[in-house]
């Protein structure tokens, strides 16, 4: 009896963790549209991003671009699965390249 209660508690906890993980919003990145120089300092980059209606910003580590961030709201669009997969692969490739260069 004690084992089944323990198992049930662990199962409920695991379900709650998975539900919370899936509910977390993704972070979208885009270059600041008005930035035209090399990004060295984060403070002006954040100001540029806030002006462009983003929530935050930072300088990219490799190319020194001003990247703005905000929470993504994905809606069902008419994009095909191939287009979505291609965008995900490109984003992942950029992240891996940036991570490899910093190691």
Curated annotation (Swiss-Prot):
Residue ranges the record assigns to the propeptide: 73-103
Keyword Disulfide bond (UniProt): yes
UniProt-listed CDD domains: Knot1
Gene3D superfamilies reported for this sequence: Knottin, scorpion toxin-like (3.30.30.10)
Family the UniProt entry places it in: Belongs to the DEFL family.
Modifications after synthesis and translation: When compared to other plant defensins, the petunia defensins have an additional fifth disulfide bond.
Superkingdom of this protein's organism: Eukaryota
Signal peptide (from-to): 1-25
Record's protein name: Floral defensin-like protein 1
Principal place of residence: secreted
Domain text: The presence of a 'disulfide through disulfide knot' structurally defines this protein as a knottin.
């Amino acid at each position: 009896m004690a084992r089944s209660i323990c198992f049930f508690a662990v199962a409920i906890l695991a379900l709650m963790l998975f539900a919370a993980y899936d509910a977390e919003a993704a972070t979208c990145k885009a270059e600041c549209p008005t930035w035209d120089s090399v990004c060295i300092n984060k403070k002006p980059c954040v100001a540029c991003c806030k002006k462009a209606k983003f929530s935050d910003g930072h300088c990219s580590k490799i190319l020194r671009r001003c990247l703005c961030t905000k929470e993504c709201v994905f809606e069902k669009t008419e994009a095909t699965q191939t287009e979505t997969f291609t965008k995900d692969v490109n984003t992942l490739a950029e992240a891996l390249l940036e991570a490899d260069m910093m190691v």
